[in-house]
């Protein structure tokens, strides 16, 4: 022991150069060490309320198992279909397990409609769905054949111009896009979320709303990528020609879908719903993806190019590149108006997690 103490006494103090090296290493490693884990508490109640004006908006959150170990977790917000709620996607065990394995935070907000004043189906309002008209003021449906789905809020506010309107009209204080912007800001500032890996996915009516991202820079600037499952924009509401900072977009449709029919490959004509008595007018899948590609700055042609994708998908793009880097991807399955989550969800997560928000967006 005495010999050990003598050795300590004889140790030389670090030189100035050695001290500088130690300080530099600490400076470089310090942020990495402190940023390795999450220092923000999780929401105790998975069902949260976000008050916007006089309206309560609800959302449910599911954390991955390793959430607290990471300061920057990827986030996917999931928009349910018409008549759904925050449980529509999150009650699916396989969907949650797949996201958990990839370390993804899932958040599912609830649309409006089930409460006052509509007391009906929850919905998301997107371009044309509340007014019932195209940009040129023409009906978005064949009103002679399509039933009147107008919500009480649409009749009372007189927002609905025609009987083709079919989603809520509670957007006087804020729109659904406003809600999503507020939700992303809340999650980014109060939870351990990577601001460069925030994504938006919608199914059916939720997928319809996704395309309005091109018209909302406040939202598009926050997103690394978006995905729409079996949801298309109404006639005339394609991505503007000079949209700024568009995130990458994935569209998954069913070739046998009669509700939001995608049309044939490279067919840019408007498609028409043909389920029962509904006759709504939508932009085709090819027109939607081609317009998004052009708005992203890609020189597009009239024919989409096949892109390698896992079976049973047939995927094509109007911009050159692989599945991991094209700005817009059109993928189709032989199915009707359904999700086929077992195939669609892994493809969507791969599409999302291979992309980060462009710096400066």
Question: How should these model regions be labeled?
Answer:
Residues 111, 227-234, 254-257:
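Active-site nucleophile loop of the alpha/beta-hydrolase fold
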Residues 33-75, 87-105, 168, 172-177, ...:
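A domain-start/cap signature at the N-terminus of enzymes
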Residues 232-249, 266-267:
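Flexible "cap/lid" loop of the alpha/beta hydrolase fold
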Residues 1-16:
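N-terminal secretory signal peptides that target proteins for export/translocation
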Residues 166-171, 272-280, 332-340:
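Active-site rim elements
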